[in-house]
Amino acid sequence: MKSRAAVAFAPGKPLEIVEIDVAPPKKGEVLIKVTHTGVCHTDAFTLSGDDPEGVFPVVLGHEGAGVVVEVGEGVTSVKPGDHVIPLYTAECGECEFCRSGKTNLCVAVRETQGKGLMPDGTTRFSYNGQPLYHYMGCSTFSEYTVVAEVSLAKINPEANHEHVCLLGCGVTTGIGAVHNTAKVQPDDSVAVFGLGAIGLAVVQGARQAKAGRIIAIDTNPKKFDLARRFGATDCINPNDYDKPIKDVLLDINKWGIDHTFECIGNVNVMRAALESAHRGWGQSVIIGVAGSGQEISTRPFQLVTGRVWKGSAFGGVKGRSQLPGMVEDAMKGDIDLEPFVTHTMSLDEINDAFDLMHEGKSIRTVIRY
């Protein structure tokens, strides 16, 4: 079938809106009509060429919502007409990782997904006979996409796709990191480095967890009003100080902050976040994705004296079994999604959405099909 899509033909180049061919779903696969998709920093990261797993030409997009059109052989968990959110972190329920009960990092389709392919090692997309790669198992920058059954969360059909599509990545990642990775407790102190969608979601999650002091940190003060709306008690612009942000936080509490979250992908900020964590029990959670080849460092004494460095992917959330409940929470107002959507656009305007993001003028732009 034909589908309009925004295709990245080469790194560092604007996306091109073209009509592509989408092949039918094979065994264990599902064809979806995408209704909405967010434009995320991870898409921009891959488009920049810095992503070690980036392959081109590719249909990007991984933060979407849509409706099932057709199912392949053996698919039982969804049927045509079901409303779904594609998952870049699958949940098969059968692999060693799923059965461990310790992680959400299912490996059922990981090997082929990282190569831009479907589980059988081929692609369902082509343009003028040339194969196009899939992206993160989702490829929501196409009006129609094919996704593995294990990479789909079935959601309430009454949910507003313009909002709940954000649960496909950023908001779930931030809120989940608070509850599942850090396990923030009432009255704990929290510092959030970077107030993009993920950082703001961390702030909201910290409020849900009834954290005491919630410190929001960003060099763009225009984001502070929204941070306060989501629950920040303090907003700090590092550029307002003539000393490192770590020292600013240690002035607030000489022993440090209970939980710090790095939501940028800057290895220097990752170190500052770790060294701002509370002596004896503080933990720092890395959520931001750093560029290819970059490494983190700190003095071992920082860990010897009780600090813990952690990472979080998709907020530790198991997509098929847990994400539908987060959609219900959003429908009840327990998760506030609407303020994240600062712009809505058509697919033809998608390059403008990337410009807004790079200029710091948007939190999330949602593309409507």
Curated annotation (Swiss-Prot):
**What Enzyme Commission number(s) does the record list for this chain?**
1.1.1.284, 1.1.1.1, 1.1.1.-
**Main location, first listed in the record:** cytoplasm
Reaction equation(s) it catalyzes: S-(hydroxymethyl)glutathione + NADP(+) = S-formylglutathione + NADPH + H(+); S-(hydroxymethyl)glutathione + NAD(+) = S-formylglutathione + NADH + H(+); a primary alcohol + NAD(+) = an aldehyde + NADH + H(+); a secondary alcohol + NAD(+) = a ketone + NADH + H(+)
Mind telling me which InterPro entries this protein's record contains? ADH-like_C (IPR013149), ADH-like_N (IPR013154), ADH_3 (IPR014183), ADH_Zn_CS (IPR002328), GroES-like_sf (IPR011032), NAD(P)-bd_dom_sf (IPR036291), PKS_ER (IPR020843)
Binding-site residues, Zn(2+) 2: 92, 95, 98, 106
Q: From which domain of life does this come?
A: Bacteria
**Cofactors:** Zn(2+)
Kindly list the places in or outside the cell where this protein is found, as annotated in its UniProt entry: Cytoplasm
Q: Residues that bind Zn(2+) 1, according to the entry?
A: 40, 62, 169
Q: Which GO terms describe its cellular component?
A: cytosol
Subunit structure as annotated in this protein's UniProt entry: Homodimer.
Q: Which family does it belong to?
A: Belongs to the zinc-containing alcohol dehydrogenase family. Class-III subfamily.
Family annotation (NCBIfam families): adh_III_F_hyde
Function, please? Has high formaldehyde dehydrogenase activity in the presence of glutathione and catalyzes the oxidation of normal alcohols in a reaction that is not GSH-dependent. In addition, hemithiolacetals other than those formed from GSH, including omega-thiol fatty acids, also are substrates. Also acts as a S-nitroso-glutathione reductase by catalyzing the NADH-dependent reduction of S-nitrosoglutathione.
Record-given protein name: S-(hydroxymethyl)glutathione dehydrogenase
Which source organism?
Escherichia coli (strain SMS-3-5 / SECEC)
Question: Its gene?
Answer: frmA
